[in-house]
């Protein structure tokens, strides 16, 4: 089983991430869904043995990180974006996000930007916003086994 920690919208507040990583056994990867990529880079230096995937958010204008990525972890295809380019704050049904994600046939879609935790089951995929480490004080864990994804949102 692959266990992934998912953070977003840390906005310079990485202490909770460090505590969570230190207290979490068997972490297979970390995903950061933007705002701030500098925080994700700092975590990658602190934990060089844990794969860390990240995208840039609306507050990462100078970052060279991509707007979205598709990765494979534990046999699952994961689409990651911050969400500002997909207008997630303004589209009640997440239409643009779903259109972009559908291109890669994902098992898991991760976005941030709204600072609000969110889970939706969409066809064979789970759409997940872990919330904000800084503001809603939440993060998520995904467990993947044989391509099957289960997620949970946790309070910090």
What residues fall within each predicted segment?
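Active-site neighborhood of phospho(di)ester-bond hydrolases with catalytic His/Asp-centered motifs
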Residues: 6-8, 29-35, 53-58, 80-82, ...
